[in-house]
Amino acid sequence: MTRISHITRNTKETQIELSINLDGTGQADISTGIGFLDHMLTLLTFHSDFDLKIIGHGDHETVGMDPHHLIEDVAIALGKCISEALGNKLGIRRYGSFTIPMDEALVTCDLDISGRPYLVFHADLSGNQKLGGYDTEMTEEFFRALAFNAGITLHLNEHYGQNTHHIIEGMFKSTARALKQAVSIDESKVGEIPSSKGVL
């Protein structure tokens, strides 16, 4: 079974090329021009064992906008690629849950590849710091776009933490580990849809 997908997303605001292999080895080739976002997506790739290539350009490079559009559109493209690569979802474990201690911060991701997109996001990032050109308040928007385009029910909870970088890093790492669990194949359920309804 090959679980690979590629998407090209071009709008008046962004240009994105993204490809993913869900059965990869954690190889990342990420270039969005937003250093902190590249760092987080590289961590997502490594901890999920996906292979991920992203080339992204946005209007923040040409007309002086903030990188809001590119951050959200990368998440949209990533979500769509994950959904497409999963295909009919036969045999997947469907659920994933992982807690990451990131120094003083503790973050949990719980997710369900349910086909019912939803985001619950509990974290205090209201200070809207800038990290490497990345607006921290965009973190919730990133995960919302990811969840709604991948068809995932996604719960992200910051239990506690002080360093914003650590909290966000914990979110990306815990999401990666939970995705790794959820997309993995349950050898006892190969060829079966993981739902009593027979459809996801």
From Swiss-Prot:
Q: Which GO terms describe its biological process?
A: L-histidine biosynthetic process
**Where is this protein localized, as stated in its record?**
Cytoplasm
Which GO MF terms does the UniProt record name? Answer: imidazoleglycerol-phosphate dehydratase activity; metal ion binding
Q: Which PROSITE patterns match?
A: IGP_DEHYDRATASE_1, IGP_DEHYDRATASE_2
Q: Can you state which reaction this protein catalyses?
A: D-erythro-1-(imidazol-4-yl)glycerol 3-phosphate = 3-(imidazol-4-yl)-2-oxopropyl phosphate + H2O
State the InterPro entries in the record: IGPD_sf (IPR038494), ImidazoleglycerolP_deHydtase (IPR000807), ImidazoleglycerP_deHydtase_CS (IPR020565), Ribosomal_Su5_D2-typ_SF (IPR020568)
Q: Report what the protein is called.
A: Imidazoleglycerol-phosphate dehydratase
Organism for this UniProt entry: Lactococcus lactis subsp. lactis (strain IL1403)
Instruction: Name the gene behind this protein.
Output: hisB
